[in-house]
Amino acid sequence: DLAKFGQFILNKGSWNNKQLLAPEYIEKLLTVYINTDDKVFPDSKLGYGYYFWKCQPEKAFRCAGLFGQYCIILPKENMVIAITSNAENEQKQAILSATWKFLAQIKKDNKSSTQDLSSLNNYLSKLHLPYLPNDNSIIPEIFQQEFKFSHNPLNLNSISFSQISPDCIRINITLNTRKYNLLAKLNTWKNNNTNSENDNFDSCTTIFYENPYANYGWQNNKLNLKLVYNQGIFIDTLEFNYYNHQLYLHYNPTSSFIIRTKPHYFISNPIK
């Protein structure tokens, strides 16, 4: 979606051969109106237009979201760059600087070929986020029972686990507003289609977004679960420990925002 929006701006308001926005409005969007030379980072000092920041490359602008989400429009290069990242404020300039360095290199080489594209696709196919470590210190007590929680900031009512196969578990999560069922695998990112609805969705405060990639691992008699939402910026890490008939949950979110500003610790009600 970010790339499509950028292409729409690059096309001066045209999409699928239809002029949806007058070109003069696009020109106004990409014009600096506010002086920002008091900012710290190089790409924040060049000025601000209507929702767009001026960038270091000639005639380049970007719209910027929280945590390193960028849609960069480069009219001179006839190029759009869409970036979704999990970055805090101090990391944002590093992302842009790396982008300009890469852009300068490909302009210097001034070539591309089918072989280059094949090599790039092969390289990209091997990239993945690191898997959680696993020492097989399984906690059998957490399976086949439901752990219930009292009132908490996550609105978490209950959670249960079941072993589907030696390398796959199912996690059933009940919140105040919905049920959330997913699969997680060892040494693999398991894609989930949760098909759950949340009428009270709020990108600032909603916990557990749709369709995460899930990976888990056992370590030091704890179950670790990581949920990656690759259509956005957030990653949730959950650590489960079982002690004295209770489930101890450590919820650690990134990036830090609203309810995600700090880790949360929960203890389930005792299993009778």
Show which residues each predicted segment covers:
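A conserved catalytic-loop motif detector
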Residues: D1-L10, S14-K39
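Active-site-proximal alpha-helical segments within enzyme catalytic domains
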Residues: D1-S14, Q69-N86
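Low-complexity, Gly/Ser/Thr/Pro-rich intrinsically disordered linker/tail segments
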Residues: Y51, C55-P57, A64, L74-P75, ...
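Active-site Gly/Thr loop motif
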Residues: E27-I83
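Short Gly/Pro-enriched loop/turn and capping motifs at secondary-structure junctions
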Residues: P57-K59, Q69, A87-E88, N230-F234, ...
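Short loop/turn hinge sites at secondary-structure boundaries
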Residues: K12-N17, D109, N187-W189
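Glycine-centered flexibility sites
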Residues: G6, G13, N17, G49, ...
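Peripheral terminal and inter-domain segments
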Residues: D116-K272
